UniProtKB/Swiss-Prot annotation:
Protein name: Polycomb group protein ASXL1
Source organism of the structure: Mus musculus (Mouse)
Ranges annotated as biased composition (Low complexity): 199-209
Motif Nuclear localization signal per UniProt: ranges: 408-415
Region (Disordered): 95-170, 183-249, 378-543, 635-823, 895-914, 926-952, 964-995, 1095-1131, 1213-1234, 1256-1338
InterPro entries: ASX-like_PHD, ASX/ASX-like, ASX_DEUBAD_dom, Asxl_HARE-HTH, DEUBAD_dom
Recorded domain comment: Contains two Leu-Xaa-Xaa-Leu-Leu (LXXLL) motifs, which may be required for an association with nuclear receptors.
GO BP of this protein: animal organ morphogenesis; bone development; bone marrow development; cell morphogenesis; chromatin organization; heart morphogenesis; hematopoietic or lymphoid organ development; hemopoiesis
Domain HTH HARE-type residues, every copy: 11-86
Matches recorded under Pfam families: ASXH, HARE-HTH, PHD_3
Keywords of the record: Chromatin regulator, Metal-binding, Nucleus, Phosphoprotein, Repeat, Repressor, Transcription, Transcription regulation, Ubl conjugation, Ubl conjugation pathway, Zinc, Zinc-finger
Taxonomy, superkingdom: Eukaryota
ZnF (PHD-type) intervals: 1476-1513
Subcellular location as annotated: Nucleus
Length: 1514
C-alpha cells in the first residue's frame, strides 16, 4: 500500500492521464472525463489548493503538442484526448466528423489551455472553468460525437455542465445596447453576430458560456476595432446553428456582468467562433485585423490559424473586459459617448444637410476628381489649418490658387459664419449680408463654424454673392471644407453674377498683387504658421474666453452667433468673439485678452489706472520714444497678438492671409523683432488686419473700381455682417487697424487706394503701395470685409466706408493733397469708415508715413521705426515708460492674445482702431501720419515747420495717447491700438518728440489722457492745420490728427479707451483731459465752446480749419441728402479734402471725442456755416431720423465717432438702446442704424456728441437742440435714455454725452468702449467741466468717476451729487462707459484729486480688486468685449448691457459696488458674464500663467502661478 500510495503521490498528471486513456482506450476522453476517472480510481493524489482540472488541462494540452507528445487532441470543438498511439483511429473518425474544422484542434487546445489558465485563476475560477467547460461541452455537443459512448459521455457532461453553469453563472440578462436607436449594423457586426452568438449556443447546453464567448469575440472585435458602439447592439434573436438558452442571458453592458470575470480567450476560440452562424462569423471577422482573417476560395473570410491566439487579440479581449468593468458599455455611458462623439463631429445641421461623402459630390464631381482636387488643396489645406486661415493655403499655392483657396476657404468658414450671422441678421439686405459675409469671411474664419451652422439657412443667398467670385473660382479648391466649399461654391455660383463684378476684378488684381503678397505671405505664413497654428489651437483650446469670438472668437463674436465652439477661430473670429466667449483662445490669449483689456482696464481701472497715470507720465517723459516702443510693442502685440490671436482666430489668417501677403509678410518679419514669432504672426495678423482695414491698397489704382465695388459689396455684406458681428467687425477693424499699423505702409496705400485716389500718392511709395495693394488686394476682400464690417455700422456706411477707406488710404498712402483730393472724390465714403480707416490709416500712416517717406522701404522702415519706437520707448521711457512698454510687451505677448482678442473682439480693436482712428482719421484723412512721418522722417517744409509744433502737439497727443494707451498698453487691445497709433505717432514724431515730449509731458502731467490738452490739441490741430495747409494732404491729415488729438481729449480718451481698451483707462484720460482742461484755459474754453477753435488754432490752422469746416459743412449738406449713405462718405470726402478733411476730421474728432464739443465749437467758430449746416443737418436729420440727426452735424465725426463709438458704443449703444442707435445714429443710415444697431447706435452717439459739440460751438441752440433731440430720441430708445440724458446735458455741455456714449461703448467693446468712453466721457467731462472751468476737470473727473462707476454711482452718488445728477445718471445709464471709466479713471488718474477723491476707496479697491479680481476684471473686461461682440452683433441691448456690466463690474469691482453695478448695469447676465474686470496692476511685472501661458501681472497670477481664467477653470 505504501508503495501504491507513494506511486500515487509521485504520479504525474501525464502518467495518470495515460493510465486512464490506456484503460479506457475505447474512445477519446475530455480532460474532465479523464479527471473523473483519475479521481474515481485514485490514480493521483489531489493536493488542496490546486485546480486538478486546470493542471490536467494544461498537461494534456502541452503534451498533445509536438512530436513527443503522449496524447493526441482530436480536432474539434471539444477537447477530446486520446493516446498518440490511438490517434490514427480517432483522427480518422474526427476527420470525417470534423474535417471541416481544421482549426478545431488548435482551438480545442486553446480552449483547454484557456480552461486551465482560467481555472488556475486568471479569472473567477469557477466561472472560467464553467465557461471553458461550457464552451468545451458546447463544442462537443455541437459537433457530432464519434461514437455512442462519446456522444453519451458528451451529453451527460453537457448536462452536468449545464447544471453547473446554471448554478455558477449568474443569470445575466443581456440587454442590447442600441447605437443611435438602432442595433449596430452588421458591418459593425458584433452586435448582430454576437447577439446571435451569445444568444444561442450550439447545443444550448452552454449558451451562457457561448454567449460569453461570442460577446467576448464581439468585445474583442470591438476592442480591436474599438467601436464601443458596436457592443451596444449585441442582442439579436437567436438564429442559425445556435439556439438561445433563454435561461442564461448574458449581460454585455454592466460592470456586474459575468464577462468581467471571464477569460474571453477561453470563450472565444475557433470552436466557439465556428459555432456561430456564418453571417455572424463573417461580420466578426471584419472586426479582426486583416492579418487575422483570410479570404477563402469561396470569397468568404476565414480565421487565420493565429487569429484568436495572439497578443493583439488577448489585449483586445482584456481591454474589452476592462471597459466592461468600467461601465463603458452601459446605456448611460454609451449615450454619453454618443453625445460626445456627436459633439466632436461638430457637424451642424446645415452641414448635415449639405453633407457630401466627398468634396464636390453634389457638384457632380467623381470621387477621383474630388480626390485630385483635394490633393492639390491638401497642402493649402494643411497650411490654412496651421495658419488658421486660408492664408497659408494661398501662400503655398500660386497667388491665384492660393487666394482662391484661401479666399474660398476663408470664405467658406467666414462666409458660412457670416451667412449664419446673416441668418441672425437677416434684417440686413441680402446683398449687404453677402458683402458682410464676405467681409467677415476673412475675419470670420474662426467664426466660420458658427456661421456655418447658420450658414445652411443664410449661406445660400448672401454668402454667394460676395464669395461667388472667389468661391466660384475657388470652389473646387476648397476641399478642406468640402461641404462649406461646395455650399459656398454653389452659393458663390449663384451669387457669382452679383459678386463677380466686384469680386472678380478684385481677385484678379489681388492675384496680381498676390504674387508679391504670396512671398510676403509665405514668410509671414511661415512665421504665422508657427505662431498662428500654435495660437489658434490655443484659441480653440481656450476659446472659452472667446468663443465669441472663429473664433470667436466670433463663432462667437456674439453669443448668439458665436458659441464657444470657435476652435477654428481665426483672427476675425478672435476679434469678433472674445476668447472667453469663443472657444477660448489660448489662455495666453485669454489672459492677454484679459491683460489687454486688463491693460486698458488695469491701467484705466484701479491699479491700471494709477499705473496708467504713472505710465502716462513716464510716457510723457518718454514722449515719442515710449510711444515708439509702445507702438512697436503694440504693433507687435497687435500684429503679433492680432495675428496669432486673430490668426488663431482665423480672421487674421483670412484677412491676414491676404494682408500678410504683402504688409504682413514684411511687417510680420519686421515686427517679429519686438515680438518674435508671435510678433511675426501677430504682426502679420496686424498687417493682415491692417491690410484688411486698408482694402483700398489692393486697388492700387487697378482695383479701384472692383475694389471699391467689392468693399461696397463687402460693406453691404459687412453691414449685415456688422450687425451679425458688429463686435467682431469692430474688432476686426481694430485688428485691421492693428494690422494697418503693422502693415501701415502697405495698408495706407490700400486705404487710399481703394478708390484709387491714393494710388497716385501711393505711387510715390509704389513699393509700399504695391505691397500694400497686393496685400490689400488679397486682403481686400477680407480687409474690405473687415473694413466694411467696421464701416458697416450702417449698410450705407459700408459703401461710404469703402470709399472713405480708400480716400483715407490715399491720404495716408498718397500725397496729402492727392490723398485729400482722393478722399474728396470718395465723398461718399462713410465717415465712420474713414474715421475707422483713418484711425487705422493714421496708425498705419504713421508707420506708413515712414513707409511713405521711405517709399518701398516703408514697410521695413515702419518695422524699423516700430522697433525704433520700441527702442526709443525703452531707451527714452523711464521705468514707468518701460513698464507701459513692458505692459505693451506684455500686451505684445498678451497683445497677441489681445490681438487675437482684437481679432476676436473687433470692438476692442475697433476701440483701438478708433483710438487710432481718431488720430488715424486725422492722419489718414489729412495724412497726419505722413506729416508725423514727415516731421519724423521727411517733414515737408510746411509740414516740418508747422508740423514741428503740430507734429509735436499731435505727437504729444499721440504720445499722450500713447502714454495713455501705453498705460493700458499691457492690455493688448488698447495697447495695440493706442500703442500702435501712438507708437506710430511717436515714431513719426520722434524727431519732433523733444518738444512734443515736453508738451506731452505737460499735457500728460495734467492728465495722461487729457494731456491731450484741448489747447495743446487745438494748437496741435492748428499747427496740424497749418501743416496740413502747407504740407497739403499730409499736413492736413496731420492737422486732422492733431485736431483729432486735440479735439480729443476725447481722442486721447478714445485712444486711451482704445489703448486701455478698458473704459477705466478711458475715464482716466477723460479725467486727465478735464485736468488738462482745467489747467489749460484754452482747452477749457475750447471745451466750453467759449473759445472758438480758430482762436486757439494758429491763423494758418484757423483758415485751414474754416476751410475744413466749410468743406465738411458742404459735404455734410450733401451728406444730409446722402447722409445715411453717401452723406457720411461726403463727410469723409470732406475730411479727406485738406480743408474739408480738416473740418470733417475736426467734426469727426469732435464727434468722436468728447473734445468734439470744444473742437466743434472751435470749428463752428471757424466755420459757423458748417456748424450751422451741421446743426441744420442734424436738425433735419433729427427730424428725419434721430440717427440722421446726428449725421448732419457730425457726418464725418459721427462716422468716425460712429466707428469709434460704434466700436465703443456698439456695445454701449446696443445696451443703451437699439433704438438709440436707430434714433441717434444719424451718421448711420436709418437702415444702417437698424441694420447695424451696434454700428448705427454708436455713430448715433458719436453723432449726437458731435452734434452737441457742434451745437455748442457752432449752433449751440440748434445743435444742442438737435443733439438733445437726438439724445431724447436716444432716450426714446431706452438704453439711449441714459445717453440721451447725457446727450441733453451734452448739448448743454457738449461732452457729457460723448462721455456717456463712450460708457455705452465700453459695454460693447472695452477697447472701442474705451475709445469712445474715453473720448466721449472725457469730452463729456471736459466739456462739462469746462463749463465751470474750475470745476471742469474735477467735474469731469467726478463725472467720469461717476460715469465709470455707475454702479458705483450709489457709492459715488455723493460725488455725483457734486456733478450734474442727470449727467451722472445718464452716464450711469451709459454705465458701461461710466463703470469702465471709473476703473480706468481711478487707476488712470490716481494723481487727479477728483478722480481719486471721487473714487478714493475705488482706486485702492480697484487695484486690489483688480489684482484680486484680475481674472475677474480681465474676464469681465473680456466678457464685455466678448459681450460687446455679442451685443454688437445682434443684440444691442445685450451688448450695452454687457458693456455696462463690464463697466459696472469694473467700476463695481473697483468701487466695491459690484452688486449694484451688475444689478443696475446688467440685467444682461451675459454682459455680466462677459464683463471682465481688468487688472489693476498694469505696472507690475508680467509673468506667464503656468496653465495657459498667458501673460498676466504678478499680482494677478499670484502664488498659484495661474491666471484668473485658469483658476476659474480649475
Amino acid at each position: 500500500m505504501k508503495d501504491k500510495q507513494k506511486r500515487k503521490k509521485e504520479r504525474t498528471w501525464a502518467e495518470a492521464a495515460r493510465l486512464v486513456l490506456e484503460n479506457y482506450s475505447d474512445a477519446p476522453m475530455t480532460p474532465k472525463q479523464i479527471l473523473q476517472v483519475i479521481e474515481a480510481e485514485g490514480l493521483k493524489e489531489m493536493r488542496s489548493g490546486t485546480s486538478p482540472l486546470a493542471c490536467l488541462n494544461a498537461m494534456l494540452h502541452s503534451n498533445s503538442r509536438g512530436g513527443e507528445g503522449l496524447f493526441y487532441k482530436l480536432p474539434g470543438r471539444i477537447s477530446l484526448f486520446t493516446l498518440k498511439k490511438d490517434a490514427v483511429q480517432w483522427s480518422r473518425n474526427a476527420a470525417t466528423v470534423d474535417g471541416d474544422e481544421p482549426e478545431d484542434s488548435a482551438d480545442v487546445e486553446s480552449c483547454g489551455s484557456n480552461e486551465a489558465s482560467t481555472v488556475s485563476g486568471e479569472n473567477d475560477v469557477s466561472l472560467d472553468e464553467t465557461s471553458s467547460n461550457a464552451s468545451c461541452s458546447t463544442e462537443s455537443q455541437s459537433r457530432p460525437l464519434s461514437n455512442p459512448r462519446d456522444s453519451h459521455r458528451a451529453s451527460s457532461q453537457a448536462n452536468k455542465q449545464k447544471k453547473r453553469t446554471g448554478v455558477m453563472l449568474p443569470r445575466v440578462v443581456l440587454t442590447p445596447l442600441k447605437v443611435n436607436g438602432a442595433h449596430v449594423e452588421p458591418a459593425s457586426g458584433f452586435s448582430g453576430r454576437h447577439a446571435d452568438g451569445e444568444s444561442g449556443s450550439p447545443s444550448s447546453s452552454s449558451s451562457g458560456s457561448l454567449a460569453l464567448g461570442n460577446s467576448a469575440i464581439r468585445g474583442q472585435a470591438e476592442v480591436t476595432r474599438d467601436p464601443a458602439p458596436l457592443l451596444r447592439g449585441f442582442r439579436k434573436p437567436a438564429t442559425g446553428q445556435m439556439k438561445r438558452n433563454r435561461g442564461e442571458e448574458v449581460d454585455f453592458e454592466t460592470p456586474g456582468s459575468i464577462l468581467v470575470n471571464t477569460n474571453l480567450r477561453a470563450l472565444i476560440n475557433s470552436r466557439t467562433f465556428h459555432a456561430l452562424p456564418l453571417h455572424f462569423q463573417q461580420q466578426l471577422l471584419l472586426l479582426l485585423p486583416e492579418v487575422d482573417r483570410q479570404v477563402g476560395t469561396d470569397g468568404l473570410l476565414r480565421l487565420s490559424g493565429s487569429a484568436l491566439n495572439n497578443e493583439f487579440f488577448t489585449h483586445a479581449a482584456q481591454s474589452w473586459r476592462e471597459r466592461l468593468a468600467d461601465g463603458e458599455f452601459t446605456h448611460e455611458m454609451q449615450v454619453r459617448l454618443r453625445q460626445e462623439m456627436e459633439k466632436e463631429k461638430k457637424v451642424e445641421q446645415w452641414k448635415e444637410k449639405f453633407f457630401e461623402d466627398y468634396y464636390g459630390q453634389k457638384l457632380g464631381l467623381t470621387k477621383e476628381e474630388s480626390l485630385q482636387q483635394k490633393e492639390v488643396q491638401e497642402e493649402a489645406k494643411v497650411k490654412s489649418g496651421l495658419c488658421v486661415s486660408g492664408e497659408s493655403v494661398r501662400p503655398q499655392r500660386g497667388p491665384n490658387t492660393r487666394q482662391r483657396d484661401g479666399h474660398f476657404k476663408k470664405r467658406s468658414r467666414p462666409d458660412l459664419r457670416t451667412r449664419s450671422r446673416r441668418n441672425i441678421y437677416k434684417k440686413q439686405e441680402p446683398e449687404q449680408a453677402g458683402v458682410a459675409k464676405d467681409a467677415s469671411a476673412a475675419p470670420d474664419v474662426s467664426l466660420s463654424k458658427d456661421t456655418k451652422t447658420d450658414l445652411a439657412g443664410v449661406n445660400s443667398t448672401p454668402g454667394p454673392d460676395v464669395s461667388s467670385a472667389t468661391s466660384g473660382q475657388e470652389g473646387p479648391k476648397c476641399p478642406s471644407e468640402p461641404v462649406a466649399s461646395q455650399i459656398q461654391a454653389e452659393r458663390d455660383n449663384l451669387a457669382c453674377a452679383s459678386a463677380s463684378p466686384d469680386r472678380i476684378p478684385t481677385l484678379p488684381q489681388d492675384t496680381v498683387d498676390q504674387e508679391t503678397k504670396d512671398q510676403k505671405r509665405k514668410s509671414f505664413e511661415q512665421e504665422a504658421s508657427a505662431s498662428f497654428p500654435e495660437k489658434k489651437p490655443r484659441l480653440e483650446d481656450r476659446q472659452s474666453f472667446r468663443n465669441t469670438i472663429e473664433s470667436v472668437h466670433t463663432e462667437k463674436p456674439q453669443p448668439t452667433k458665436e458659441e464657444p465652439k470657435v476652435p477654428p477661430i481665426r483672427i476675425q473670429l478672435s476679434r469678433i468673439k472674445p476668447p472667453w466667449v469663443a472657444k477660448g483662445r489660448p489662455t495666453y490669449q485669454i489672459c492677454p485678452r484679459i491683460v489687454p483689456i486688463t491693460e486698458s482696464s488695469c491701467r484705466g481701472w484701479t491699479g491700471a489706472r494709477t499705473l496708467a497715470d504713472i505710465k502716462a507720465r513716464a510716457l510723457q517723459a518718454r514722449g515719442a520714444r515710449g510711444y515708439h516702443c509702445n507702438r512697436e510693442t503694440a504693433t507687435t502685440a497687435i500684429g503679433g497678438g492680432g495675428g496669432p490671436g486673430g490668426g488663431g482666430s482665423g480672421a487674421i489668417d483670412e484677412g491676414g492671409g491676404r494682408d500678410s501677403s504683402s504688409g504682413d509678410g514684411s511687417e510680420a518679419c519686421g515686427h517679429p523683432e519686438p515680438r518674435g514669432a508671435p510678433s511675426t504672426s501677430g504682426e502679420s495678423a496686424s498687417d493682415l488686419q491692417r491690410t484688411q482695414l486698408l482694402p483700398p491698397c489692393p486697388l492700387n489704382g487697378e482695383h479701384t473700381p472692383a475694389e471699391a465695388a467689392m468693399p461696397r459689396a463687402r460693406r453691404e455684406d459687412s453691414a449685415s455682417l456688422r450687425k451679425e458681428e458688429s463686435c467682431l467687425l469692430k474688432r476686426v477693424p481694430g485688428v485691421l487697424t492693428s494690422g494697418l499699423e503693422d502693415a501701415s505702409q502697405p495698408p495706407i496705400a490700400p486705404t487710399g487706394d481703394q478708390p484709387c485716389q491714393a494710388l497716385p500718392p501711393l505711387s510715390s511709395q509704389t513699393p509700399v503701395a504695391e505691397m500694400l495693394t497686393e496685400q490689400p488686394k488679397l486682403l481686400l476682400d477680407d480687409r474690405t470685409e473687415c473694413e466694411s464690417s467696421r464701416e458697416d455700422q450702417g449698410p450705407t456706411i459700408p459703401s461710404e466706408s469703402s470709399s472713405g477707406r480708400f480716400p483715407l488710404g490715399d491720404l495716408l498712402g498718397g500725397g496729402s493733397d492727392q490723398a485729400f483730393d482722393n478722399m474728396k472724390e470718395p465723398v461718399s465714403m462713410t465717415p465712420t469708415f474713414i474715421s475707422e480707416l483713418s484711425l487705422a490709416n493714421y496708425l498705419q500712416d504713421r508707420p506708413d508715413d515712414d513707409g511713405l517717406g521711405l517709399g518701398a522701404t516703408g514697410l521695413l522702415i515702419r518695422e524699423s521705426s516700430r522697433q525704433e519706437a520700441l527702442t526709443e520707448a525703452f531707451a527714452s521711457g523711464s521705468p514707468t515708460s518701460w513698464v507701459p512698454i513692458l505692459s505693451n510687451y506684455e500686451v505684445i505677448k498678451t497683445s497677441d492674445p489681445e490681438s487675437r482678442e482684437n481679432i476676436p473682439c473687433p470692438e476692442p480693436q475697433d476701440e483701438k482702431e478708433w483710438e487710432r482712428a481718431v488720430p488715424l482719421i486725422a492722419a489718414t484723412e489729412s495724412v497726419p501720419q505722413p506729416e508725423s512721418c514727415i516731421s519724423h522722417w521727411t517733414p515737408p517744409p510746411a509740414a516740418v515747420g508747422s508740423t514741428g509744433s503740430d507734429s509735436e502737439q499731435v505727437d504729444l497727443e499721440r504720445l499722450e495717447m500713447n502714454g495713455i494707451s501705453e498705460a493700458p498698453s499691457p492690455h493688448s487691445e488698447s495697447t495695440d491700438t493706442a500703442s500702435d497709433s501712438e507708437g506710430h505717432l511717436s515714431e513719426d514724431s520722434s524727431e519732433v518728440d523733444a518738444s512734443e515730449v515736453t508738451v506731452v509731458k505737460g499735457s500728460l502731467g495734467g492728465d495722461e489722457k487729457q494731456d491731450w490738452d484741448p489747447s495743446a490739441s487745438l494748437s496741435k490741430v492748428n499747427n496740424d492745420l497749418s501743416v496740413l495747409t502747407r504740407t497739403g494732404g499730409v499736413a492736413a491729415s496731420q492737422s486732422w490728427v492733431s485736431r483729432v488729438c486735440s479735439v480729443p481729449h476725447k481722442i486721447p480718451d478714445s485712444l486711451l479707451l482704445s489703448s486701455t481698451e478698458c473704459q477705466p483707462r478711458s475715464v482716466c484720460p477723460l479725467r486727465p483731459g478735464s485736468s488738462v482742461e482745467v489747467t489749460n484755459p484754452l482747452v477749457m474754453h475750447l471745451l466750453h465752446g467759449n473759445l472758438p477753435l480758430e482762436k486757439v488754432l494758429p491763423p494758418g490752422h484757423r483758415s485751414s480749419r474754416l476751410e475744413s469746416s466749410q468743406l465738411p459743412l458742404r459735404e455734410q449738406s450733401q451728406d444730409r441728402g446722402t447722409l445715411q449713405g453717401t452723406g457720411e462718405n461726403n463727410r469723409l470726402a470732406a475730411r479727406i479734402n485738406p480743408g474739408s478733411a480738416q473740418t470733417l476730421k475736426e467734426s469727426i474728432l469732435a464727434q468722436s471725442y468728447g473734445a468734439s464739443a470744444g473742437l466743434v465749437r472751435a470749428m463752428a467758430s471757424k466755420a459757423p456755416a458748417m456748424s450751422q449746416k451741421i446743426a441744420k443737418m442734424v436738425t433735419s436729420l433729427d427730424s428725419q431720423h434721430p440717427e440722421t440727426e446726428l449725421t448732419p452735424s457730425s457726418g464725418n465725426l459721427e462716422e468716425i465717432d460712429s466707428k469709434e463709438h460704434l466700436s465703443s458704443f456698439l456695445c454701449e449703444e446696443q445696451k443703451e438702446g437699439h433704438s438709440l442707435s436707430q434714433g441717434s445714429d444719424p451718421g448711420a443710415a436709418p437702415g444702417q442704424c437698424l441694420g447695424d444697431h451696434t454700428t448705427s447706435k454708436v455713430p448715433c452717439f458719436s453723432s449726437t456728441n458731435v452734434s452737441l459739440s457742434f451745437g455748442s460751438e457752432q449752433t449751440d441752440g440748434t445743435l444742442s437742440d438737435q443733439n438733445n433731440a437726438g439724445g431724447h430720441e436716444k432716450k426714446l430708445f431706452g438704453p439711449g435714455n441714459t445717453v440721451t440724458t447725457l446727450q441733453c446735458p451734452r448739448s448743454e455741455e457738449q461732452t457729457p454725452l460723448p462721455a456717456e456714449v463712450p460708457p455705452v461703448f465700453p459695454s460693447r467693446k472695452i477697447e472701442p468702449s474705451k475709445n469712445s468712453v474715453s473720448g466721449g466721457v472725457q469730452t463729456t467731462r471736459e466739456n462739462r467741466m469746462p463749463k465751470p472751468p474750475p470745476v471742469s476737470a474735477d467735474s469731469i473727473k467726478t463725472e467720469q468717476t461717476f460715469l465709470r462707476d455707475p454702479i458705483k454711482a450709489d457709492a459715488e452718488n455723493r460725488k455725483a451729487a457734486g456733478y450734474s445728477s442727470l449727467e451722472l445718471v445718464g452716464h450711469l445709464q451709459g454705465m458701461p462707459f461710466v463703470v469702465d471709466l471709473p476703473f480706468w479713471k481711478l487707476p488712470r488718474e490716481p494723481g487727479k484729486g477728483f478722480s481719486q477723491p471721487l473714487e478714493p476707496s475705488s482706486i485702492p479697491s480697484q487695484l486690489n480688486i483688480k489684482q484680486a479680481l484680475y481674472g475677474k476684471l480681465s474676464k469681465l473686461q473680456l466678457s464685455p468685449t466678448s459681450f460687446n461682440y455679442s451685443s454688437s452683433s445682434a443684440t444691442f441691448p445685450k451688448g450695452l448691457a454687457g458693456g455696462v456690466v463690464q463697466l459696472s463690474h469694473k467700476a463695481s469691482f473697483g468701487t466695491g459696488h459690484t452688486a449694484s453695478l451688475s444689478l443696475q448695469m446688467f440685467a444682461d447676465s451675459s454682459a455680466v458674464e462677459s464683463i471682465s474686470l481688468q487688472c489693476a496692476c498694469s505696472l507690475k511685472a508680467m509673468i506667464m500663467c503656468q496653465g495657459c501661458g498667458a501673460f498676466c501681472h504678478d499680482d494677478c497670477i499670484g502664488p498659484s502661478k495661474l491666471c484668473v481664467l485658469c483658476l476659474v477653470v480649475r
